[in-house]
Curated annotation (Swiss-Prot):
Official protein name in the record: Leucine--tRNA ligase
Species, as recorded: Pasteurella multocida (strain Pm70)
Enzyme Commission number: 6.1.1.4
Reactions that this protein is recorded to catalyse: tRNA(Leu) + L-leucine + ATP = L-leucyl-tRNA(Leu) + AMP + diphosphate
The gene coding this protein: leuS
Motif 'HIGH' region: chain residues: 42-52
Keyword Cytoplasm: yes
Ligand binding (ATP): K622
Length: 860
């Protein structure tokens, strides 16, 4: 064993051993309980960032721990390889997206290997390869045959100059990123999958995911947005036409003072035919793309249509307005407005001089005055005809019943969730497998024609997708007849919605999945990824699993039993202001710091000596140039040190502040562990621990060892508080470094302790532990060594600390043998000088004993 800890010598050697022995290869074994641990796969952007390192370190710790606990562990890795950034990089670097992507994959794969992650690389999937997306295309055609796929027009960002569709990321302040032309909203046909058919299952399934974070489940519930309401039909005045609205508050129905419709509503478009001003307003609304999240805060705008709707219960006319806050794709594209009892409706009504009608009063109060409106809580109806005096529930049902009896309404469950639009007018994605025949009929491509391959050797001009620009690519045949391929590609969330399942049989060529393998490994036991995916990927992931279940591939209802959402990695960010008033961000690796005695940053300077502004700890990002390159850190400190810091510096689900001083501390700790094993090996143990031969000091040290084992096992296995597990090991190490190695049993206890510490640290710092395990005389590799178990007998305390009180105040703490009787403890307490002093001149009237903890005297 070498004297110094040299990660640069150890780590590459251990990684080579793992690669040559295929240590982490997962093979189905029905004799062992399986454990599938999965971290969200990366987009191959070029380099790993610290967020990746944190995610994959957590997954690797869990995987190695479970393997030591006798599980058959699957921990795969792959690449979410399609996506818009590749197109931008290809244009910038004058290359093809495929070439750029594959080069990045090679580079990042090597980065993952030098961090020592125990992935089964034989199961690697790359989503841009035809053998992967072939089955995605096939599955889409099967969903189409089941009626779960349809095509309809939908709004996109359109650059009229380039005549191309733009992704949201390519619209900068309302203009095209390339030519600065104002962007328009355009309706084009797009493909959708009916996720709304599964809304109730997706909602109900959340109740069966006890090991998912509540925050994620709440976000999904809100995203699905189930509501119970009434769909109400208004007859239009002087017309045969109707207008349907949806409301969750039928109790406020008598407070309707106007109806608002979306700019794209047929009624609005019809009303605009002879009203140029209204037509212009509608066009303005359509060209202003608004995210749902912005609706609450944006300025409310509207215009009267000149059309009136007849209130079905009062017969009164209410005006119909076009409003920019009504979305065509939610509900019916029309809302009944009740300004007296809705904030948004009130804001609009006050702006345009529309009445605020008050029809709900507080349950225990008087009707409110107009300036106190809107009153948005549930209450008691008044000014509501026959429904006066009813509370919310009674009014909901009574008004719904009345409308249903009149044929003017029906109870309805609505969802905020929209069907999943999967068409993208981009090149770098999987082609959508639909064909258009000469007669206009659209048909799914047959299996024998799949995959419809994306040409990889292309030139990107930054304007048009190469498969849209090349009319020859689209030409094909169907049953001998000419046909055209769809030139849109799939949303890249399609690939990431089923990759977890393909890992179970990545090379299976006969079908999308090998059902035997899928049902052995699935569901995923532990899934790890960022909470930013809560309402997109994690919802599609659950949806796809139900689709796979209904197609007969899997038997489980949910894709993952347990979810851990790791926190972001933060780092200090520094900048100076340029002469043009621009912030120039400087990498923390190029900054010299002055700190106070508590380590707080006082001043920061760049290499030119410029004083910098410290903007605090923020998420590592390219925009603030505060990312720390994992590879540089591994080269400087070793992979184990980086991994240890990542797991120790913060609870897994909280943000982690990157502090190089903390990384240095992690390296010193591993150095102390190495030194302790080196010193122990000079005089190793000649015998095993003999519990009956131990002194009280030896028993105490051994007790600490086994209590630490119990805590670490619980912290890693159940609680997943990895940082507290490491803290407990560090605390034990402090005791071990001070422990004597003189007696035979001293060395026996040290042997037992070091064997335990090395195994407990192995999931976190596997390279050093692999080597130390060998240095401690073990012939088998640590990778399949059993997890260390705490000895219950060793944890029993020989002594206990009893607090002594006199009249409720602590007067002493006495250490007594664990088995000492109450009477004997009383005598020890009475013998204490401070207790005796406070009992002097008093009569003991009562004693209270809480076994092993407290002895209390009540005296007068």
């Amino acid at each position: 064993m070498q004297e110094q800890y040299r990660p640069d010598l150890i780590e590459a050697e251990v990684q080579q051993y793992w690669a040559e022995n295929k240590t982490f290869k997962a093979i189905k074994d029905t004799n062992k309980p399986k454990y599938y641990c999965l971290s969200m796969f990366p987009y191959p952007s070029g380099r790993l960032h610290m967020g990746h390192v944190r995610n994959y370190t957590i997954g690797d710790v869990v995987s190695r721990y479970q393997r030591m606990n006798g599980k058959n562990v699957l921990q795969p890795m792959g690449w979410d390889a399609f996506g818009l950034p590749a197109e931008g990089a290809a244009i910038k670097n004058k290359t093809a997206p495929a070439k750029w992507t594959y080069e990045n994959i090679d580079y990042m794969k090597n980065q993952l290997k030098i961090l020592g992650f125990g992935f089964d690389w034989d199961r690697e999937v790359t989503t841009c390869k035809p053998d992967y997306y072939k089955w995605e295309q096939w599955f889409f055609t099967e969903l189409y045959k089941k009626g779960l796929v349809y095509k309809k027009t939908s709004t996109v960002n359109w650059c009229p100059n380039d005549e191309t569709v733009l992704a949201n990321e390519q619209v900068h302040e309302g203009c095209c990123w390339r030519c600065d032309t104002p962007v328009e909203q355009k309706e084009i046909p797009q493909w959708f999958i009916k996720i709304t058919d599964y809304a109730e299952q997706l909602l109900g399934g959340l109740d069966h995911l006890p090991l998912w974070p509540d925050q994620v489940k709440t976000m999904q519930r809100n995203w699905i947005g189930r509501s119970e309401g009434v769909e109400i039909t208004f007859q239009l005045a002087n017309s045969e036409d109707n207008l349907t609205v949806y409301t969750t508050r039928p109790d406020t129905f008598f407070g309707v003072s106007y109806v608002a419709v979306a700019a794209a509503h047929p009624l609005a478009e019809k009303a605009a035919e002879n009203n140029p001003e209204l037509a212009q307003f509608i066009q303005e609304c359509k060209n202003t793309k608004v995210a749902e999240a912005e609706l609450a805060t944006m300025e409310k705008k509207g215009m009267a249509t000149g059309v009136y709707a007849i209130h079905p219960l009062t017969g009164e006319k209410v005006p119909v307005w076009v409003a920019n806050f009504v979305l065509m794709h939610y509900g019916t594209g029309a809302v009944m407005a009740v300004p007296g009892h809705d904030e948004r409706d009130a804001e609009f009504a006050r702006k345009y001089g529309l009445p605020l009608l008050n029809v709900i009063k507080p349950i225990n109060g008087e009707p409110l005055l107009e300036h106190e409106l809107p009153y948005c809580e549930h209450g008691i109806l008044f000014n509501s005809g026959e429904f006066n005096g009813l509370d919310f529930d009674a009014a909901f049902n009574a008004i719904a019943d009345k409308l249903e009896a009149l044929g003017k309404g029906k109870r309805q469950v609505n969802y905020r969730l929209r069907d999943w639009g999967v068409s993208r007018q981009r090149y770098w994605g999987a082609p959508i497998p639909m064909l258009t025949l000469e007669n206009g009929e659209v048909v799914p491509a047959p299996l024998q024609d799949l995959p419809i391959e994306l040409p990889e050797d292309v030139v990107m001009d930054g304007v048009k997708s190469p498969i849209k620009a090349d009319p020859e690519w689209a030409k094909t045949t169907y049953n001998g007849q000419p046909a055209l391929k769809e030139t849109d590609t799939f949303d890249t969330f399609m690939e990431s919605s089923w990759y977890y399942a393909r890992y179970t049989s990545p090379k299976f060529a006969e079908a999308m999945l090998d059902a035997d393998e899928a049902n052995y490994w699935l569901p995923v036991d532990q899934y790890i990824g960022g909470i930013e995916h809560a309402t997109m990927h994690l919802l599609y992931f659950r949806f796809f699993h139900k689709l796979l279940r209904d197609a007969g591939f899997v038997t489980s209802d949910e894709p993952a039993d347990k979810l851990l959402c790791q926190g972001m990695v933060l780092a200090d960010a520094f900048y100076y202001t340029s002469p043009t008033n621009e912030r120039i961000w400087v990498s923390p690796t190029e900054v010299t710091l002055e700190r106070d005695e508590k380590g707080r940053i006082l001043k920061a300077f760049d290499k030119e000596g410029r004083e910098l502004v410290h903007s605090g700890m923020t998420k590592m990002s390219k925009s603030k140039n505060n990312g720390i390159d994992p590879q540089e850190m591994v080269e400087k400190y070793g992979a184990d040190t980086v991994r240890l810091f990542m797991m120790f510096a913060s609870p897994a689900e909280m943000t982690l502040e990157w502090q190089e001083s903390g990384v240095e501390g992690a390296k010193r700790f591993l150095g102390r562990l190495w030194n302790l094993v080196f010193e122990y090996n000079k005089h190793p143990a000649e015998t095993t621990v003999e519990p009956t031969a131990l002194s009280s000091a030896q028993k105490a040290l051994r007790r600490d060892v086994h209590k630490t084992i119990a805590k670490v096992s619980d912290d890693i296995g159940r609680r997943q508080t990895f940082n507290t597990a490491i803290a407990a090991i560090m605390e034990l190490m402090n005791k071990l470094t001070k422990a004597p190695l003189v007696e035979v049993q001293d060395r026996a206890i040290m042997a037992e302790a070091l064997s335990a510490v090395v195994r407990m640290l192995y999931p976190i710092t596997p390279h050093i532990c692999f080597q130390l395990w060998k240095d401690l005389g073990n012939t088998e590799a640590i990778d399949f060594a059993p997890w260390v178990e705490a000895d219950a007998a060793a944890m029993v305390d020989d002594e206990k600390l009893v607090v002594v009180q006199v009249n409720g105040k602590v007067r002493a703490k006495v250490t007594v043998p664990a088995e000492m009787s109450e009477d004997d403890i009383k005598q020890v307490a009475l013998a204490d000088s401070n207790v005796a002093k406070h009992l002097e001149g008093l009569n003991i009237v009562k004693t209270i004993y809480v076994p092993g903890k407290l002895f209390s005297f009540v005296a007068k």
